[in-house]
C-alpha cells in the first residue's frame, strides 16, 4: 500500500502533508512554498495552477478562477452565489443542472473540476517528494459543509485521480495536530477563520481520544469578505476623488483585490500601510489616474468589525450545543490565516476569557491533521480514536411541508437512525421521500439533498401502511437513505446525490479530461525543458566556437554552425515538438564533442602552454557540453 497523503483544500491556499515517522510533515511545492494558492487560470496556450496562476491574474482576470470552494456543491440561485457573482471578475454560470459552475475561455467547468486541478497539484507535490505514485488521500472540508458540498469534494478527488479514503472536518484535523502528543484530558475550542469559510468546534481530548461535542459555522464568511470590504472602500474613495467608477473594470478590480490582500496582511504587523496603484484608470481628458491611499489598522477594523462580530454567533451556538460555558474551555486553537489579524485575536480572547494557543501554524495545522488521520487509516498511527459529528440536522418533509428530524445536528458519526411514517391519503400507492438538511422548522427553508419514490404500496386507509425511513451517515458525513414498506418488504435505497450534483458519467468524463490535461501539461513541460536545454547548449557551444574555433579545422566549425542553425530554425517554428528539439540537441552535442576532442588534442600536443584549460578536462571520455562551458570560463580567467 502506497503512502496516504493529507490535503487541506483551502479557499485561498492549499497544503499537503504526510506522516514522516511519528510526526506529520508539510511538503514544499515545486516553487519552494509550503502552501499553494488555490487558483487556476486558463490562457490561450496552457492551464496554470498555484503561484503561476496568481501572478498573471491582473492581466487575465476573466479566466483566473479563485475561491471556487465557496461555490462547490452550491446551486446557482443560492443567495450566497448571487452575492459572489458581484465580487469576482470571472463568470459564474448555470451548469445545466442548476449547480453553480464557472466559465473560462468559453468553456464551462464545475467547481469540482477546478478543485481537482488544485488537488492534482497537491498530488504532484507529494509524488515529487516521495518519488512514487500517490493514489489515496484524506481531504479536509469545513465542518459546516453540507452533504452536497462533501460529495462534490469527494468527486474532485476522484477527478484528480485520488481515492478519497476520508473526508475530515478542518477544525477536527487541527485538533488532531494540536493534541497528538497531549496525554491529559482537556476541552478545546477550535476557531477556524479561513479564506472563505468559518467554523468553530468544541472537542474533548483525552489520551488519544478526540471526541467532537459540537460544531457550528458559516460557509460564506472568510478572508475573501474582508478583502472585498477593503476593495469597496478603495473604489469608493477613488470615485469621490476622481469621479471614476472602478467597479466595472475587471482588471482594475483584480489589482485592487491583490492590493487589499497585501494591505490586510501588512496591517497585522504594522499600524499603517500605503496602497499605491499607478495608472489604474484614465480620466475624462485621457490623463492617467493613480490610486495612492493610506490605510490604517483602525480603519480596517472599522470596515470589517461586523464580520468579526458575526463569527461570535456560531461560537455561542457551539458552546450551547456542547452544554458548556466559555470558562469550561481549557485551550483555544486558532486556525486559518485570518486569525493573524490582531482584532480577531482580541475578540476571540474577549469571548473565551483567555488568550488563544499560539503553538500551531494556522496555515499548516489542518493539512498536518489530515496526514495524521491518513496515518490512522494506514495503521501507522496507533492509539488515536476520532469521533466526529454531523454539523446539520437531517430529516424528511412530512405533511404540511414540516421538516421532521431523524438525526439531530452534533450527533456522533457514523450513525444510523430509523423512524416509521405512514400515508396521508386513503389508498395512496406511492410516497415521495424528500430529504433535507438544516435547522429550520419548515422543509422548504432548509437545503434539499435529494428525493426518491417508494411505489406499489398496497391500497389501504390513510395511516395504515408502515413505511420505515432509515438515515445512514458514514464517517465522511455523507448520507444514504432507505425507505421500506414493512407490509410488503419492498425497499428503496439511495446514496444522496444533490438535485444537481455530478452524475457518474459526468465524473468519468471529467476524470478522462483531467488525464488528458495531465498528458498535455506533461508534454508542455517537456517542450519547455527541451527549449531551455537547447538555448543553453546553443549559448555555450557558440561561446566555445568563438574562443577555440581557430584551434580546429574549418570543417568541424562549419558542422557545428550548421547543427546550431538547424536547431535555431526548429526553435523558431510554431508547433515544434519536444522530440524534434531533442534530436537537434543531439546533433549539436555530437558536433560539439569533436570541437572538445580537437581542443584537448591541441592542448596535449602543446604541452603545458595552457595548464588551466588542460586541467579542466576530466580524465575519462565522458565529455558533456557543460564542461566545454567550464573550459571557456577557465580560458577567460
From Swiss-Prot:
Spell out the Pfam families in the cross-references.
HSP70
Residues modified as Phosphothreonine are 197
UniProt region (Disordered), positions on chain: 600-637
Which keywords belong to this entry? ATP-binding, Chaperone, Nucleotide-binding, Phosphoprotein, Stress response
**Which Gene Ontology molecular-function terms are recorded?**
ATP binding; ATP-dependent protein folding chaperone; unfolded protein binding
Alphabetical list of PROSITE patterns matching this protein: HSP70_1 (PS00297), HSP70_2 (PS00329), HSP70_3 (PS01036)
For bias type Acidic residues, the affected ranges are: 621-637
Up-regulation conditions: By stress conditions e.g. heat shock.
Q: What does this protein do?
A: Acts as a chaperone.
The family database entries (HAMAP family) matched by this protein are listed as: DnaK (MF_00332)
Q: Which PANTHER family match?
A: HEAT SHOCK PROTEIN 70KDA
Tell me its family: Belongs to the heat shock protein 70 family.
Quote the protein name from its UniProt record. Chaperone protein DnaK
Q: Which organism is it from?
A: Ruegeria pomeroyi (strain ATCC 700808 / DSM 15171 / DSS-3) (Silicibacter pomeroyi)
The gene behind this protein is dnaK
Amino acid at each position: 500500500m502506497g503512502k496516504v497523503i493529507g490535503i487541506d483544500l483551502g479557499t485561498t491556499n492549499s497544503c499537503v502533508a504526510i506522516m514522516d515517522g511519528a510526526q506529520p510533515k508539510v511538503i514544499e511545492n515545486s516553487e519552494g512554498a509550503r502552501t499553494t494558492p488555490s487558483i487556476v487560470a486558463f490562457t490561450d496556450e496552457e492551464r496554470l495552477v498555484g503561484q503561476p496562476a496568481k501572478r498573471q491574474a491582473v492581466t487575465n482576470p476573466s479566466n483566473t478562477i479563485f475561491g471556487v470552494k465557496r461555490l462547490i456543491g452550491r446551486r446557482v440561485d443560492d443567495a450566497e452565489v448571487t452575492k459572489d457573482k458581484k465580487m469576482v471578475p470571472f463568470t459564474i454560470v448555470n451548469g445545466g443542472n442548476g449547480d453553480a459552475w464557472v466559465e473560462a475561455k468559453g468553456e464551462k467547468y464545475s467547481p469540482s473540476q477546478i478543485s481537482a486541478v488544485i488537488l492534482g497539484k497537491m498530488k504532484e507535490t507529494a509524488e515529487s517528494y516521495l518519488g512514487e505514485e500517490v493514489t489515496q488521500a484524506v481531504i479536509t472540508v469545513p465542518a459546516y459543509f453540507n452533504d452536497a458540498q462533501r460529495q462534490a469534494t469527494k468527486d474532485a478527488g476522484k477527478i484528480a485521480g485520488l481515492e478519497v479514503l476520508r473526508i475530515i472536518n478542518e477544525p477536527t484535523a487541527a485538533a488532531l495536530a494540536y493534541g497528538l502528543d497531549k496525554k491529559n484530558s482537556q476541552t478545546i475550542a477550535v476557531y477556524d477563520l479561513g479564506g472563505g469559510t468559518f467554523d468553530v468546534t468544541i472537542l474533548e481530548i483525552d489520551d488519544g481520544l478526540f471526541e467532537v461535542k459540537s460544531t457550528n459555522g458559516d460557509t460564506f464568511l472568510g478572508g475573501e469578505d474582508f478583502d472585498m470590504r477593503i476593495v469597496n472602500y478603495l473604489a469608493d474613495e477613488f470615485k469621490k476623488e476622481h469621479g471614476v467608477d472602478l467597479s466595472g473594470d475587471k482588471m482594475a478590480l483584480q489589482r485592487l483585490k491583490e492590493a487589499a490582500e497585501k494591505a490586510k496582511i501588512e496591517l497585522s504587523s504594522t499600524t499603517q500601510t500605503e496602497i499605491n496603484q499607478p495608472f489604474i484608470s484614465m480620466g475624462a481628458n485621457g490623463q492617467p489616474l493613480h490610486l495612492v491611499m493610506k490605510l490604517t489598522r483602525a480603519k480596517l477594523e472599522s470596515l470589517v468589525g461586523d464580520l468579526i462580530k458575526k463569527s461570535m454567533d456560531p461560537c455561542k451556538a457551539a458552546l450551547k450545543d456542547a452544554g458548556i460555558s466559555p470558562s469550561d474551555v481549557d485551550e483555544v486553537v486558532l486556525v486559518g490565516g485570518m486569525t493573524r489579524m490582531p482584532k480577531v485575536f482580541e475578540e476571540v480572547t474577549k469571548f473565551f476569557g483567555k488568550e488563544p494557543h499560539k503553538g500551531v501554524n494556522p496555515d499548516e495545522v489542518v493539512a498536518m491533521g489530515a496526514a495524521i488521520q491518513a496515518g490512522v487509516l494506514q495503521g501507522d498511527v496507533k492509539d488515536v480514536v476520532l469521533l466526529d459529528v454531523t454539523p446539520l440536522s437531517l430529516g424528511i418533509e412530512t405533511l404540511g411541508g414540516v421538516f421532521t428530524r431523524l438525526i439531530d445536528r452534533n450527533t456522533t458519526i457514523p450513525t444510523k437512525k430509523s423512524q416509521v411514517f405512514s400515508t396521508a391519503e386513503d389508498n395512496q400507492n406511492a410516497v415521495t421521500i424528500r430529504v433535507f438538511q438544516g435547522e429550520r422548522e419548515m422543509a422548504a427553508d432548509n437545503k434539499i439533498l435529494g428525493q426518491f419514490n417508494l411505489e406499489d404500496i398496497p391500497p389501504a386507509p390513510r395511516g395504515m401502511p408502515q413505511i420505515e425511513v432509515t438515515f445512514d451517515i458514514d464517517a465522511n458525513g455523507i448520507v444514504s437513505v432507505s425507505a421500506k414498506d414493512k407490509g410488503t418488504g419492498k425497499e428503496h435505497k439511495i446514496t444522496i446525490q444533490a438535485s444537481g450534483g455530478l452524475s457518474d458519467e459526468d465524473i468519468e468524463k471529467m476524470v478522462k479530461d483531467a488525464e488528458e490535461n495531465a498528458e498535455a501539461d506533461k508534454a508542455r513541460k517537456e517542450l519547455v525543458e527541451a527549449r531551455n536545454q537547447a538555448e543553453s547548449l546553443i549559448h555555450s557551444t557558440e561561446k566555445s566556437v568563438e574562443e577555440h574555433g581557430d584551434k580546429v579545422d574549418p570543417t568541424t566549425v562549419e558542422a557545428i554552425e550548421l547543427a546550431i542553425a538547424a536547431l535555431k530554425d526548429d526553435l523558431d517554428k510554431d508547433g515544434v515538438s519536444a522530440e524534434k528539439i531533442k534530436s537537434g540537441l543531439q546533433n549539436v552535442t555530437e558536433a560539439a564533442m569533436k570541437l572538445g576532442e580537437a581542443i584537448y588534442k591541441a592542448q596535449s600536443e602543446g604541452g603545458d602552454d595552457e595548464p588551466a584549460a588542460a586541467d579542466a578536462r576530466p580524465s575519462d571520455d565522458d565529455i558533456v557540453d557543460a564542461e566545454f562551458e567550464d573550459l571557456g570560463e577557465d580560458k577567460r580567467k
